[in-house]
Regions:
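N-terminal segment of the canonical double-stranded RNA-binding domain
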Residues: 1-37
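Acidic, low-complexity intrinsically disordered segments
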Residues: 41-76
Length: 76
């Protein structure tokens, strides 16, 4: 499943995946920075296994917001 959310001039994309051999879900985080030069996408590792698809996505979006609020540096 995938969620995209606009946040403070960025786009947070959270993707979750169900594990095959174990119960639970893992997720990936991408943050897009849109500016006059185009779009820069930065990927982040999201630690942990989540009990549900929804909890994985919610946690990943919160991590994305924290990264933006903390002033991460987009990769060029």
């Amino acid at each position: 499943m995938k969620v995209r959310e606009a946040y403070k001039g960025h786009v947070i994309e959270a993707m979750s995946f169900e594990l095959r051999d174990n119960p639970g879900f893992v997720s990936e985080l991408f943050i897009e920075k849109h500016d006059s030069e185009g779009v820069t996408v930065t990927q982040f590792f999201v630690p942990g296994v989540f009990k549900s698809d929804e909890s994985a996505l919610q946690a990943t979006v919160l991590i994305g917001r924290h990264k933006i609020d903390s002033g991460y540096a987009p990769r060029a």
